[in-house]
Amino acid sequence: MLRIDNLKLPVGAKEDKLRAACAHALRVSEEALVSVKLLRRSIDAREGVKLVCSVAVEVKNESGVWKRCKNKNVQPYAPKKYTPPAPVSAPEVSPVVIGAGPAGLFCALLLARCGARPILLERGRAVEQRKRDVEHFWRTGELDLTSNVQFGEGGAGAFSDGKLNTGTKDLRHGYILEEFVRFGASEDILVDAKPHVGTDKLYVVLQNLRREIIDRGGEVRFSHKVVDIEQNSGSVTALRVSAPEGEYTLPAKHVVLAPGHSARDTFEMLQKRGVPMEPKPFAVGVRIEHRQRDMDLAQYKEAAGRYGLPPTSYKLSCHTEKGRGVFSFCVCPGGEVVAAASEEKRVVTNGMSEFARDGENINGGLLVSVTPEDFPSGDTLAGVQFQRELEDAAYRLGGGNYAAPAQRVEDFLKHRPSTGAGKVVPTYLPSVRWCDLHGCLPPFVCEALKEGLPMLGRKLRGFDAPDAVLTAVETRSSSPVRIVRDNLSFRSALRGLYPCGEGAGYAGGIMSAAADGLRVAEMILEELNHE
């Protein structure tokens, strides 16, 4: 089999055009092609809009064709797939997974499939009820501290748009994508360069994934929050769990800690118990909204709105004179800015898109890098304190009831309050309050954004448009701490504890978190095989 990369086609090209392009690249007739399989596709809008594909081809006289075609984009291809570990005997004490985000779910899934009968503990609710709780909050401003955009089945990623981007070639990623499809996602994610599931389809995927864990002998307990870890001689022995029926003790020898980046009370408990942690860099800022059609025009130019092109996205970054990174994050085409608070009287924003991505606006995080040197103290959890201070200030500036402070870009750059929307109507609910965001963002963040916006506008026309809307504050781009673990065994210094996923500081997004969950499950299964 041969792989052809960088195969360029007109947007909207049909399968016959793909076969013809493959034959041309290989310098053979179409009749010589035995099979053609699309591996990857993307849209390149830099010089005219083109579809760029990678394709696996079976062709007659393969070795002769490869030698003769002399095309640097053609190479021999032997597809590789992830091989799950062998099954194990069910242990006397079930492994426990804390947190039902991507890391916890895929860890529990692999453990269950291999016969380990895991117990998955999630502090929030099942996605069906969680969806109702979140939508009630957006309508009314009545926040449920146990079931919100941060806590519940699926983790924070359940209310994004299910972006499955990854920059690595780990074989686990193909396995994860195939599982998403098996559980209800579109097959397009297997080939799209920027795959996304869509928040609406994620609800279905999560329910099916949960059923698989249970059908394979696992157990899933919602509204069960781990409040303490019991230990003896440096090893985990049990967990104290708060549940609707009251507290109970759960014996445990293998505990996967995948709490998510917003489990601040869990971080505090771990600190009290002496579990090694360290502060880590992250980023804070705002969500920026534009009209989708304006960004489509900037990227696709005269092709905008034609050929069935998808709503465009973007990925932008720059550095200020002082070395601060300013960059886009979690861009949601055709989406909306959402209220993502998980603590009382604190405003947090995030972005979300459904599968169709057919909303009026596109939004993305516009973030500034921060390091532990920016935090208010040298404490391990000083990053949490820093986040809370920004969220408190945003709540006050928004005027209460989880209204978010908002400002037009032109007004932000001129340091004057906004009085209303221009061409771009903000999507955040329950509501926004027009003001000056300098009242809730640290001076160094404002300075970096004011320097960065024009630079990014030069990279993408209209990004710094006067009527683009900034909504504050975005603080939960990644975890403010790293729960220290061994690089080989994935264990904490507290034996039997396996920090995992984004909340533990070892991932950044759905794909990397899910892959980390698989890695930790593999290690536990190996240990169970030797017990």
Regions found by a protein language model. Give the residues of each.
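Residues forming the flavin
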Residues: M1-E531
